[in-house]
Amino acid sequence: MPKMKTKKSAAKRFVVRPGGTVKRGQAFKRHILTKKTTKNKRHLRGATAVHDSDLNSVRAMLPFA
């Protein structure tokens, strides 16, 4: 059986919290920000949790987290 490895791209994007939820950054805030309202950009600040439907995929990419 081959060695299990962490997907490094996923390790840079996700953080597993002690309770088991996975934290991720918000999308749509890197560029083309001039046409977005201040309120919209403000709501994109901070991190949010990965949705339940994507959780198994993310955990499979992070076997040691």
Swiss-Prot record:
Provide a GO CC annotation, any one: cytosolic large ribosomal subunit
Q: Name one GO molecular function term.
A: structural constituent of ribosome
Q: Does the keyword Lipid metabolism apply?
A: no
Keyword Ribonucleoprotein belongs to the record: yes
Domain of life where this protein originates: Bacteria
Q: Which SUPFAM superfamilies match?
A: L35p-like (SSF143034)
Q: What is this protein called?
A: Large ribosomal subunit protein bL35
